[in-house]
Swiss-Prot record:
The encoding gene: rsmG
Protein name as it appears in the record: Ribosomal RNA small subunit methyltransferase G
Positions that bind S-adenosyl-L-methionine: 78, 83, 129-130, 144
Keywords, alphabetical: Cytoplasm, Methyltransferase, rRNA processing, S-adenosyl-L-methionine, Transferase
MF GO annotations: rRNA (guanine-N7-)-methyltransferase activity
Keyword match Transferase: yes
EC number: 2.1.1.170
Gene Ontology cellular component terms for the protein in this record: cytosol
UniProt xrefs under SUPFAM superfamilies: S-adenosyl-L-methionine-dependent methyltransferases
First-tier enzyme category under EC: transferase
Keyword Glycoprotein: no
Principal location class: cytoplasm
Cited Pfam families: GidB
Lineage summary: Bacteria, Pseudomonadati, Pseudomonadota, Gammaproteobacteria, Pseudomonadales
Family (UniProt): Belongs to the methyltransferase superfamily. RNA methyltransferase RsmG family.
């Protein structure tokens, strides 16, 4: 159940992140949270079981990457419960956001969210990353707790080109993973993120293809 405390935490946290949510966006994010809480009991969408932790660890964590979203077509790989792709679709109705996951339960949940929240800019794809072939390269490809940087780059290489930005949301700065980055990728920048209500470290690594 979504409480007034959750609503206040979302409003305050978004402001701390420099994001001015409209009333409609605030309501949509809370409606998404309500669906996540409801479906998580049966579908195991997230390891976070306590609804009181979901605003910071899911919604605000997803919103923390908003300043780094450029371009019109984005892919959220291994989206799971829809993070960060669904919050991105709510914040950016003018952008096309695709969610990709190989787990049928999770894509069914994502489809339900799309229908209930009327997110016409959201596409749900049930597939493994290496098997999905887009018609044109994405402007950006993002993942949150999906895999190692090596696998993230390797499994999604074909979805982008030299103009694409790969955004990997991580906890601790993964220096060991950067060493194993495929030779045709390089680190463009690394950002330390501060997420309201989250105690642990958060980092965003932005990768580019060199060829």
């Amino acid at each position: 159940m979504v409480t007034p405390q959750h609503a206040q935490e979302l409003s305050t946290g978004a402001r701390e992140l420099g994001i001015d949510l409209s009333e409609a966006q605030h309501e949509q994010l809370l409606a998404y949270l309500a669906l996540l809480i409801k479906w998580n009991k049966a579908y195991n969408l997230t390891a976070v079981r306590n609804p009181d932790e979901m605003v910071s660890r899911h919604l605000l964590d997803s919103l923390s990457v908003v300043p780094f979203i450029e371009g019109t077509r984005w892919m959220d790989v291994g989206s799971g419960g829809g993070m960060p792709g669904i919050p991105m679709a709510i914040l950016f109705p003018e952008r096309n956001i695709s969610l990709l996951d190989s787990n049928g339960k999770k894509t069914r949940f994502q489809t339900q969210v799309k229908l209930e929240l009327k997110l016409d800019n959201l596409e749900v794809i049930h597939s493994r990353a290496e098997n999905y072939q887009p018609d044109v390269p994405f402007d950006g490809i993002i993942s949150r707790a999906f895999s190692s940087l090596e696998d993230f780059a390797g499994w999604t290489r074909h979805m982008g080109d030299v103009n694409t930005r790969w955004l990997a949301m991580k906890g601790l700065h993964p220096a060991d993973e950067l060493v194993a980055l495929p030779s045709d990728f390089h680190l463009d920048s690394a950002q330390a993120l501060t997420v309201p209500g989250c105690q642990g470290q958060r980092h965003l690594l932005i990768l580019r293809r060199t060829a």
